[in-house]
Design a protein with these regions (language model features):
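Helical catalytic core of nucleic-acid polymerases
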Residues: 1-86
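Non-catalytic terminal/accessory segments
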Residues: 11-12, 112, 119-121, 142-143
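Catalytic palm active-site di-aspartate
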Residues: 30, 119-133
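Hydrophobic alpha-helix feature that most strongly marks membrane-spanning transmembrane helices
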Residues: 34-35, 107-114, 129, 133
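Short, contiguous acidic/charged loop-to-helix segments that flank catalytic cores in large enzymes
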Residues: 88-98, 131-134
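Short amphipathic alpha-helix segments
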Residues: 94-114
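Short secondary-structure junctions
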Residues: 111-118, 148-152
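Polymerase palm active-site segment centered on the conserved acidic dipeptide of motif C
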Residues: 134-176
Length: 176
């Protein structure tokens, strides 16, 4: 919706500071506004004002054209999206956008790793768990650039096990 994504702090923390609430409360408020419709009391916040406008515009366009188009060009027809309303459509498009963008990134990551000793162990909607071969640590910077090519900031964590991960500065490989 045109709001910048903070690079050094979580979006939820940025909004928590804006709301004057805790991080946990911020997540609840944010998800309620994004998935349940923006409540009047939050329309003064630029992000939510833009989200509300985007929901209305998307809903009008969906009803006018009879379909909605995903970022990669898939057309989802009204006939196939039963019992739809404006907020459900917005949620659906958030999920579709996230999935499509992640599939593009995942494809690039898999191509990047193709001729390497490093391997992907696990992928979730917001994380890649990689087993990086010790001779290929220098490739982390290129991998970070590849992933961030879609405009989303990336954090890198290293550890000997999933439960012992530490954030690192990719430039210096120092623990943050």
């Amino acid at each position: 919706v045109g709001e910048p994504i903070p690079l050094d702090v979580s979006g939820h923390q940025t909004l928590a500071d804006m709301y004057g609430v805790s991080y946990g409360d911020s997540k609840g408020i944010t998800f309620r506004q994004l998935y349940g419709g923006v409540q009047e009391e939050y329309l003064h916040i630029p992000l939510f004002s833009k989200v509300s406008h985007k929901i209305d515009k998307m809903w009008m366009e969906f009803n006018r054209r009879g379909y909605i188009e995903t970022p990669l060009g898939r057309k989802l027809s009204k006939e196939n999206l039963k019992d739809m309303n404006a907020n459900k459509l917005f949620n659906y498009m958030l999920q579709a956008t996230e999935t499509e963008l992640n599939m593009v990134i995942l494809s690039k990551v898999m191509g990047f790793l193709e001729d390497k000793h490093s391997k992907m162990v696990l992928y979730t909607y917001d994380s890649y768990l990689l087993d990086i071969h010790s001779d290929e640590f220098d490739d982390l910077q290129n991998l970070k650039i590849l992933i961030e090519g879609n405009g989303f900031p990336t954090k890198i964590e290293l550890g000997d096990s999933y439960s012992k991960m530490n954030s690192i500065d990719i430039e210096t490989m120092d623990t943050i």
